[in-house]
Amino acid sequence: MSTSIHATTIFAVQHNGHAAMAGDGQVTLGEQVIMKQTARKVRRLYNDKVLAGFAGSVADAFTLFEKFETKLQQFSGNLERAAVELAQEWRGDKQLRQLEAMLIVMDETSILVVSGTGEVIVPDDNLIAIGSGGNYALSAGRALKRNATHLSASEMAYESLKVASDICVFTNDRIIVENL
């Protein structure tokens, strides 16, 4: 049995001038054991002006949160600059390259995915998801954004994660939504 500890499924959306990020609460040990059902995978950073969520190794994610928050401070809350600088450091540092996690970071105007291979990705349609249930959440989110425009960003984030939790065994329905 694998002893790696993973946490999965984050979804972020900007809709009608509002931004929301949702994460489920499940932390899995290896492939078979649920260690925790109420983890908080979405955090507020930089005076509550930035949201960050992680999928992947829990310990690695905490390292990345800390490094990203340092970059935000260094670049006065400039989300894009902080994300690019983190990605460059992550890609260029031999020890950091070993980290197994991805981040979604967002403020009121931007959503970015930051990966350990140095990518900083801006989604085309103002929504993105990562983690084992990410594809399910992304599909649900796109359908909601196209066909349920009356929903708030927060409702879209919650419902997208709910769909993922119904399909993905590594995603539960203990959903936490943060809004900007």
Swiss-Prot record:
Binding-site residues, Na(+): S165, C168, T171
For this UniProt entry, what is the primary localization, expressed as one broad class? Answer: cytoplasm
Q: Which UniProt keywords apply?
A: Allosteric enzyme, Cytoplasm, Hydrolase, Metal-binding, Protease, Sodium, Threonine protease
Annotated Pfam families: Proteasome
Activity regulation, in the record's words, is: Allosterically activated by HslU binding.
Q: Does the keyword Metal-binding apply?
A: yes
Name of the protein in its database record? ATP-dependent protease subunit HslV
What organism does the UniProt record list as the source?
Staphylococcus saprophyticus subsp. saprophyticus (strain ATCC 15305 / DSM 20229 / NCIMB 8711 / NCTC 7292 / S-41)
Q: Which reaction does it catalyse?
A: ATP-dependent cleavage of peptide bonds with broad specificity
From the UniProt record, which GO molecular function terms apply?
metal ion binding; threonine-type endopeptidase activity
Q: How does it assemble?
A: A double ring-shaped homohexamer of HslV is capped on each side by a ring-shaped HslU homohexamer. The assembly of the HslU/HslV complex is dependent on binding of ATP.
What is the recorded function of this protein according to its Swiss-Prot or TrEMBL entry? Protease subunit of a proteasome-like degradation complex believed to be a general protein degrading machinery.
Protein localization:
Cytoplasm
Specify the superkingdom. Bacteria
Q: Which Enzyme Commission number(s) are listed?
A: 3.4.25.2
- The yes or no answer to whether the keyword Transport is present is no
In its UniProt record, which GO terms are filed under biological process? proteolysis involved in protein catabolic process
Query: Which family would the database say this protein is a member of?
Result: Belongs to the peptidase T1B family. HslV subfamily.
* InterPro entries found in the cross-reference section: ATP-dep_Prtase_HsIV_su, Ntn_hydrolases_N, Proteasome_sua/b, Proteasome_suB-type
Q: Which SUPFAM superfamilies match?
A: N-terminal nucleophile aminohydrolases (Ntn hydrolases)
Which Gene3D superfamilies does the record associate with it? Glutamine Phosphoribosylpyrophosphate, subunit 1, domain 1 (3.60.20.10)
Name a single GO cellular component: proteasome core complex
Q: Which CDD domains match?
A: protease_HslV (cd01913)
Source species taxonomy = Bacteria, Bacillati, Bacillota, Bacilli, Bacillales
Q: Where is the active site?
A: T8
